[in-house]
Amino acid sequence: MTAQNNYFLVEGKYNTARVFSQKRDETAVEQIAAICSNAAYKNSQIRIMPDYHPGLGSVIGFTATLENRIIPNTVGVDINCGMHCSRLGKVEINFRLLDQFIRSSIPHGFKHNQKISPRIPSDIKEEIVRVSKKLGLGADNQLKGIGSLGGGNHFIEINQAENGDKYLVIHSGSRNFGLQICNYHQKQAYQYCRQQYKKAADLELKVEYDLNKSNSFLEGKLAAEYYQDMKVAQKYADLNRKIMAERILEFLELEALASFQTRHNYINFEDHIIRKGAVSAHQDEKILIPLNMRDGSILARGLGNPD
């Protein structure tokens, strides 16, 4: 532990990660060490958040600079899982009626809408149809998923700030669409690494490609293809949350005073950082971090820490 900087280091074969925490979760540390021992991230700057914990495919609270290789399972199946936040002001809400509306009108769990939402822009619809066809999916079913909550830790709630303002907060992602994209490209990654392993003459290079189905990586044209599909999934998730918010606000007969989204499971193609259970916090960037049902969420602005 480096007391002054409040982090400890986890080393692997190719890289060393900084973990900004005073506590060691050994299961999560093993996952971090495995990441640092994967050639996909040998040139990345890896930083782990204070609330890190074990995850499926990767440790949660993971950030790394995007280099030439990518493991689809790092971001995982719920591409662009994140938060939509709308400030409503000091309004009165009938929570019983709102609860009834949400339960009856916003599909949750494995359910989706009966019809495709007319709110979906035509250009995004075309992109979703294109990716669906490539993956052998029914495009209509994927489109019907837009405007649905999903399951797990996804939620819709009304929060109240200390000043009395109420906020509509929605936590959801890319539904089955993101899952299918991840699974397709992770399979591609395994096949690619197997091929490269067989072709490699150099022993060290052979070791880099000697990976299993869950931690194989993509590079070159295959990585670019994954990024292209991922960008569509990220649009899907943003739109999914936005449409749910619009429907709820229409029911409440309210207009949002301000709205924004905070994503915590995605690749940011502007700052080229992979985030898994972590958010962007550039200087003055508005962010929302969900805590739990007791404490609600944190509204904050980024400090732009370069580390």
Model-based region annotation:
Residues 113-118:
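Short coil/turn segments at secondary-structure boundaries
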